[in-house]
A protein has these predicted regions:
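Selective transmembrane-helix segments that form parts of the transport pathway or gating/packing helices
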Residues: 1, 39-40, 44, 70-98
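Helix-loop-helix units of permease transmembrane domains in multi-pass membrane transporters
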Residues: 51-81
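Central hydrophobic cores of alpha-helical transmembrane segments
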Residues: 2-5, 298-310
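Terminal transmembrane helical anchor/hairpin motif
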Residues: 10-27, 99-100, 104-261, 308-388, ...
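Hydrophobic/aromatic residues in alpha-helical transmembrane segments
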Residues: 41-48, 61, 96, 285, ...
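Long, hydrophobic alpha-helical segments
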Residues: 31-54, 58, 89, 93
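Hydrophobic residues within alpha-helical transmembrane segments
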Residues: 80, 84, 273, 304-305, ...
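Cytosolic-side membrane-insertion boundary helix
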Residues: 256-277
Length: 398
């Protein structure tokens, strides 16, 4: 608690923002509550890694074999104690953050409802193979490798909008059904990533706006709605390029619709609960390692696993698969994909990032985190840990 208060007192004077209010809020949320959350995860994970190992090394588990103790007392008790500590620290952290004041309401963020990357990649593969100008080395490559490469690159696929043309992307109906406050967030680019002038018209159902700015910037475009606009519209975000140059964007990354959600305090509450779910999973993982390994080895293994979990998504993003990739690099990518898939329960929730960007932590995402990170995964890990504890205790008695 004292360290949390110290972080809220000292860190705001150290970190620097871009000078804007929005930038200052984002930097504060990432630097102060984010740092408290990160340190809490590492500290409780290391603590959990030593609980059972220390009891085993001091022969207390051998006594548990003489006077049988339930798995709840051996493992669920320490887990609940660690989670209670985390809940107190996170609640204190949230209280200090909200008391600072000056926060803005959060917003729902909607992405376009596009075809799955696998389907889009298959269609693109058919077009590539049907093109007579496709190199022979591409035609002779295994289809599964080509498909894997296209799926990985689908998220960064650009679409071009020439002057006088328009492009549309479907969105959920609720994105255009709100009474006010609809914003289109778009990042335009050019062929050589050069800064250029931009002008056009953005429409979403009954909402519309005229945009005149520059490319290479993330634009938040407030949309307005005529008072006499009736029914009969579709929820498609359309952009008509009225400028003189072709603009480009990535539909899966650069196009979003924002609508009002609720207050920052409610979003902070949901984000804190999501943080607690992740901490619960980490504590259960630490207790599981503690039953099988000595304390130093368990702590080392847990910290390495935590670092690899955070690095795997970045590796997949920065080093995409190519046809001429060496076998050793392909093996590394396969391992990174496996790690990213296996640890998605921990790396998936991004409560600090959502708070910093003003994104609403949805109740559905919180429910998924609570079910997977706080219930299912800890039950599985602690059940395995309880089995190992009883086996070790029985072996010591024998």
């Amino acid at each position: 608690m004292a360290l949390t208060a110290l972080a809220h007192l000292l860190l705001p004077a150290i970190v620097r923002s871009d000078g804007t209010e929005a930038g200052g809020r984002e930097v504060f949320l990432r630097a102060v509550p984010g740092s408290v959350y990160m340190v809490l995860c590492v500290a409780l994970l290391a603590c959990a890694c030593g609980l059972v190992a220390r009891a085993r090394e001091s022969h207390r588990l051998a006594l548990a074999a003489v006077r049988p103790v339930s798995a709840g007392a051996l493992l669920f008790g320490p887990l609940l104690a660690l989670v209670a500590v985390a809940a107190l620290v996170l609640a204190f952290n949230a209280g200090l953050t909200c008391a600072r004041g000056g926060w803005t309401d959060c917003r729902h963020v909607y992405a376009p409802e596009l075809d799955p990357p696998e389907k889009a990649a298959r269609q693109m593969l058919q077009e590539i193979l049907a093109n007579t100008n496709t190199p022979q080395e591409v035609r002779s490559a295994p289809r599964h490798r080509l498909l894997s490469i296209l799926i990985g690159r689908e998220v960064d696929r650009y679409e071009s909008i020439p002057p006088g043309r328009d492009m549309a992307w479907p969105f959920p109906d609720e994105a255009a059904s709100v009474p006010e406050g609809v914003v289109a967030r778009i990042r335009f680019s050019t062929q050589f990533n050069m800064r250029a002038s931009l002008s056009g018209v953005v429409t979403l159902g009954p909402w519309s706006a005229v945009v005149s700015n520059n490319t290479q910037s993330v634009l938040e475009i407030p949309l307005s709605r005529p008072p006499d606009q009736g029914a009969g519209w579709d929820a498609k975000l359309k952009f008509r390029n009225t400028g003189k140059s072709t603009v480009m964007l990535r539909p899966r990354r650069d196009v979003e619709v924002l609508t009002p959600a609720d207050s920052f305090g409610m979003n902070m509450l949901r984000a804190t609960c999501e943080m607690l779910c992740v901490v619960t999973f980490l504590c259960a993982f630490g207790l599981f390692l503690s039953t099988a390994l000595s304390r130093p080895v368990a702590v080392f293994t847990a910290l390495v696993a935590l670092v690899v979990t955070e690095m795997a998504p970045a590796v997949l993003e920065q080093y995409p698969e190519t046809l001429d990739l060496p076998l050793s690099d392909r093996i590394g990518l396969w391992l990174s994909r496996g790690v990213a898939f296996a640890t998605s329960a921990v790396s998936g929730p991004q409560p600090v990032s959502d708070l910093a960007t003003g994104t609403c932590v949805e109740w559905s995402a919180l429910g998924h985190a609570a079910l997977v990170d706080a219930v299912v995964a800890p039950l599985v890990l602690l059940s395995l840990a309880a089995y190992l504890v009883r086996r070790r205790a029985s072996a010591s008695r024998g």
